[in-house]
A protein has these predicted regions:
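Acidic active-site catalytic centers that drive phospho-/nucleotidyl reactions
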Residues: 21, 115, 146
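Residues within alpha-helical segments
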Residues: 79-83, 120, 141
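ATP-binding N-lobe of GHMP and related small-molecule kinases
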Residues: 2-107, 125, 129-134
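Alpha/beta catalytic cores of group-transfer enzymes, especially the acyltransferase/condensing modules
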Residues: 131-146
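Short, small-residue alpha-helix embedded
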Residues: 113-127
Length: 146
């Protein structure tokens, strides 16, 4: 299942659709060391998405959004995803991220998780694919269980 598909512009900007999803089944397992639970799920994307635009930046992570009440710091999963990406890559880096929210917040549709996944995929493309899909999945697991 593709959660995001990015379009790269001039090697410095990635534009992604971050699709909502619904769980068709959800089995909750044991608690992980990070406090989240292991889950097994069958999910399906739906035709509702947030637009995520990621621009390469040398040093800072800056998030802007069309919703004033969304966090723009490390409490935002997209911000945390960016931090994890550069930590794993072992280089200083940053990004300017704009999130146009269409997915309802806290509705169980994985809007925030999808935004984090979109940022990881976008950065991976912008930095010439340093991580495999499996490695990106491991980075994403550090951010949550969705």
């Amino acid at each position: 299942m593709i959660l995001s598909k990015e379009t790269i512009i001039n090697g410095k900007r990635a534009i992604c659709r971050s699709y909502a999803k619904i769980n068709l089944t959800l089995d909750v397992g044991g608690k992980r060391s990070d406090g989240y639970h292991e889950i097994k799920t069958v999910m399906q994307t739906v035709n509702l998405f947030d637009l995520v635009i990621v621009d390469k930046c040398d040093s800072e992570i800056k998030i802007t959004t069309n919703k004033k009440f969304l966090p723009t710091n490390s409490k935002n999963i997209a911000y945390a995803a960016c931090e994890e990406f550069f930590k794993a890559l072992g280089i200083p880096g940053g990004a300017r991220i704009f999130i146009h929210k269409n997915i309802p917040i806290a509705a169980g549709l994985a809007g925030g998780s999808g935004n984090g996944a979109a940022v990881l995929c976008a950065l991976n493309s912008l930095y010439s694919q340093p991580f495999s899909d499996n490695e990106l999945e491991k980075l994403a697991l550090k951010l949550g269980a969705d």
